[in-house]
Amino acid sequence: MSNVDHAEIAKFEALAHRWWDRESEFKPLHDINPLRVNWIDERVGLAGKKVLDVGCGGGILSEAMAQRGATVTGIDMGEAPLAVAQLHQLESGVNVEYRQITAEALAEEMPEQFDVVTCLEMLEHVPDPSSVIRACFRMVKPGGQVFFSTINRNPKAYLFAIIGAEYIMKLLPRGTHDFKKFIRPSELGAWSRSAGLTVKDIIGLTYNPLTKHYKLAPDVDVNYMIQTLREE
């Protein structure tokens, strides 16, 4: 069975034309992107690296990593977001190879081909996150690194990521997230280790509704990102 949730894909298909509008539903992704790219770049040195972006959507992260000097491939199962990504790179002049394929299928085709794999804000949108994590392990070279980000599953995350973000501040459309699909750091760590990855670091991403600014912080109660390594 394919590890694809067609209802999840449909959500983002409907919004795809606004992906690069910084005042749209995708404003949070634009706002947090520099923080995440910097965090990744500090740990791997993106320049000259061959990078795979799993669940690339409209290409916000993919383009940013390419601008840092990486050779980037972005994959997604959403046809409309990929079309937007391909159009936008014509405007921006950034070169990214985009493909409509699952991580699992690409792992069969391109094992151990990438220095770095990123999979950000994607695991909470698939039926079996552990399957994606195993595919990421297969695609990264020995000695390479894989980065994941997702949302913690606890009452605070429900309050901030769903009630706050979707209903009160309206940062995201209602129904963007399903609380049951949120992932605790302990679960993400266990799935990563089971796949063969070593967890190296974890960082939280916090939002101040008064200043409307995001920052990286030790608080992993809501949004967080982990760095993992495939040992040589």
From Swiss-Prot:
Class of the enzyme per the UniProt entry, highest EC level: transferase
Keyword Methyltransferase: yes
Keywords: Methyltransferase, S-adenosyl-L-methionine, Transferase, Ubiquinone biosynthesis
Job of this protein: O-methyltransferase that catalyzes the 2 O-methylation steps in the ubiquinone biosynthetic pathway.
InterPro entries listed in its UniProt record: SAM-dependent_MTases_sf, UbiG_MeTrfase
Superkingdom of the organism of origin: Bacteria
Organism: Pseudomonas fluorescens (strain ATCC BAA-477 / NRRL B-23932 / Pf-5)
Gene3D superfamilies: Vaccinia Virus protein VP39
PANTHER family listed in its UniProt record: METHYLTRANSFERASE, UBIQUINONE BIOSYNTHESIS O-METHYLTRANSFERASE, MITOCHONDRIAL
Record family assignment: Belongs to the methyltransferase superfamily. UbiG/COQ3 family.
GO molecular function: 2-polyprenyl-6-hydroxyphenol methylase activity; 3-demethylubiquinol 3-O-methyltransferase activity; polyprenyldihydroxybenzoate methyltransferase activity
Transmembrane segments: none
Pfam families: Methyltransf_23
Catalytic activity entry: a 3-demethylubiquinol + S-adenosyl-L-methionine = a ubiquinol + S-adenosyl-L-homocysteine + H(+); a 3-(all-trans-polyprenyl)benzene-1,2-diol + S-adenosyl-L-methionine = a 2-methoxy-6-(all-trans-polyprenyl)phenol + S-adenosyl-L-homocysteine + H(+)
GO BP terms: methylation
Gene from which the chain derives: ubiG
EC number in record: 2.1.1.222, 2.1.1.64
Protein name (database record): Ubiquinone biosynthesis O-methyltransferase
Pathway recorded for this protein: Cofactor biosynthesis; ubiquinone biosynthesis
Binding site for S-adenosyl-L-methionine: R36, G55, D76, L120
